Amino acid sequence: MNNFVILPILIPLLSAILLIFMTKNLMLMRIFSTAASAIGIVISGILVQTVFTKGIQTLSLGGWKAPYGIVLAADQFASLLVLTTAIIGLLVGLYSFRSVGEKRERSFYYSGVQFLLAGVSGAFLTGDLFNMYVFFELLLIASYMLIVLGGTKIQLRESLKYIVFNIVSSALFVIGVGFLYAVTGTLNMADLSVKISESGQTGLITVIGVLLLLVFGMKGGIFPLYFWLPGSYYAPPAAISALFGALLTKVGLYAITRVFTLIFIHDTAFTHQLMIWLAALTVIFGVIGSLAYSNVMKIVIYNIITAVGVILFGVAVHTPASIQGAIYYLIHDMLIKGALFMLAGTLIALTGTASLHKMGGLIKRYPVLGWMFFISAISLAGIPPLSGFVGKFKIAEGGFAEGEFTISMLILLSSLLVLYSVLRIFIHAFWGEEKETPKPNHRTAKGLLYPAAIFLLLSLLFGLGTEWVSPYVDQAAETLLNPEKYIEAVLKE
């Protein structure tokens, strides 16, 4: 039992509450929020290393042992995602200084960001489904506030769709959890794994599993449940879009990965095959969307959907290579989507438009921005040796090993189409005839580029430093592939 496990949740939660009382002092809010996020990175980094050297860390809150009490469990998969979340929180905060506007900043913006980070980290670390629901609600309430902050017409329109859709998904989550408790008498995920293997009610459990796949698919943006995503991520400022794009769909994917490698593993011939086909359709429709638009932000947003499909395929194939690849690609996508949203937001801020047809020749004025965008584009597409390559290659390798040749080829082909979709932005915006744009503001450009540059650097290091990263990813994959290790760590006391 390790009290350290709760700190990635507790620090942003307490910070969010304290930030509510600091709205009159903008500089204090910025400093405090940045410091809280930096401390979160340090704490999460220590947690990753502790899990690597000492194994899965658990904490039973209130002294109630599992499966009766609330348990937090940090395996390497959860710990790596918590660390990535903390990094994203810090960099989005830095980007916000120059992008969201003072009015939004004073309207409890930083408090909302910290509440969201607490909810995301809690969803990663919780050991039971009910508290996963609680943390989902915490991050969703924070996201409701952030998406409407500013009160523009498009924000109010898209937020209504976003809120209604998530209320429905949350209601279905409660129903699914209730059914599962009625059948098994427990909601602790480790205990559920044991009880389901002993229950013999495979048909009913499979139905509940499909219901939870629907719930997490709604939150993760899986076909055909992603229709809420493009508008909702497009409506708020770029900093909030970066936060949403890097984190929110990943929580849904994490939940799918956790429950379908730990709990619902009794009927993989049906559940995992269903996930494979949903993954393929998600990739196809994500690619179509990214090619159909000439709006910079919409192109980036639809590439989120493509990535969701790629990761889901890796989880569904469920081989050592594909699970490792899914973890690599999940972390890669969190980092590179953060960079791309920031770069797209910077591009829009400097040109005053999101339309590719109204951009051109920007490489002369903003060469650093141009080449940063190019590197982000090829990294997103998975061009070797950048970070997207390792994950996508391993996912395809696992798919080929399981005989999923057609969909594995689709995953590889999607790299070329993703590359084409984002290179359209690079070619139209930075090359060709220079279009009339607002007077250059190099001070603003630099302030916006620094956080994006750090994101891009981390993404490059993640790809080029595969040899250093792989032991951590391998350990994370091993726990997912051998759930008895997680079960033993949680139920041992």
Swiss-Prot record:
Keyword Zinc-finger: no
Sorted UniProt keywords: Antiport, Cell membrane, Hydrogen ion transport, Ion transport, Membrane, Sodium, Sodium transport, Transmembrane, Transmembrane helix, Transport
Molecular-function GO terms, alphabetical: NADH dehydrogenase (ubiquinone) activity; potassium:proton antiporter activity; sodium:proton antiporter activity
Alphabetized Pfam families for the sequence: Proton_antipo_M
Disulfide bonds: none
Superkingdom classification of source: Bacteria
GO cellular component, as recorded: plasma membrane
Membrane topology: Multi-pass membrane protein
Gene Ontology BP, a term: ATP synthesis coupled electron transport
Chief localization: membrane
Subcellular location: Cell membrane
Transmembrane segments: 3-23, 31-51, 77-97, 107-127, 129-149, 163-183, 203-223, 227-247, 251-271, 274-294, 299-319, 330-350, 370-390, 407-427, 449-469
Keyword Hydrolase among record annotations: no
Its biological purpose: Mrp complex is a Na(+)/H(+) antiporter that is considered to be the major Na(+) excretion system in B.subtilis. Has a major role in Na(+) resistance and a minor role in Na(+)- and K(+)-dependent pH homeostasis as compared to TetB. MrpA may be the actual Na(+)/H(+) antiporter, although the six other Mrp proteins are all required for Na(+)/H(+) antiport activity and Na(+) resistance. MrpA is required for initiation of sporulation when external Na(+) concentration increases. Also transports Li(+) but not K(+), Ca(2+) or Mg(2+).
Oligomer and partners: Forms a heterooligomeric complex that consists of seven subunits: MrpA, MrpB, MrpC, MrpD, MrpE, MrpF and MrpG.
Family: Belongs to the CPA3 antiporters (TC 2.A.63) subunit D family.
UniProt miscellaneous comment: Mrp-dependent antiport apparently occurs by a secondary, proton motive force-dependent mechanism, but the similarity of several Mrp proteins to membrane-embedded subunits of energy-coupled NADH dehydrogenase complexes raises the possibility that there is a capacity for electron transport that could provide a primary energy coupling option for Mrp functions.
Designated name of the protein: Na(+)/H(+) antiporter subunit D
